[in-house]
Amino acid sequence: MSNVSGLFKDLTTVKKARNGRLASWDQRGKNQDYWEIPAGETISLGEVEGPGCITHIWMTSSCRKVVAPSILDPVLNASAAPVMEIHPALGVIWDDYDPFYYRKVLIKITWDDQDTPSVLAPLGDFFCIGNSYPGNFSSLPFNVSLKPEEAGRYGAPCSVSCYFPMPFNKKAKIE
């Protein structure tokens, strides 16, 4: 039981520190708080000056492949969020999830201006989504959550969390 009580020991300790949060929220007031990342491109999910400690990473993730004409073309309709849910009518599916998505996308974490990242892994492997097949689970360091109707689908959209404390001295960068 001493290990469990150790988890909560610091809750009542006053610390001389500051808290912060990075988010992708849409400042225009719309619900387009997402990033589209073209193949071969890299975006920065966050860059923080230190010293500090990343204590939680949370994100949702989805990758749709358009398999027929679609209203979700961001070139033709910039106001249509590609994360909208459009359920198939009469069994016709206009787009589908990329079954290999969680293996194709890499997460890269670099500390203190290192030349090589300390973390470089497929997104699914980092968040415990083996073989691009997400399933609901919760553990102390990781959590994956998906809607019941998405269960059993390779590349299905889900939300993921990581609670590993990741301390750094000068800077942390997540791509």
Go through the PLM ranges and name each one.
Residues 1-175:
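Beta-strand-centric surfaces of beta-sandwich/beta-rich domains
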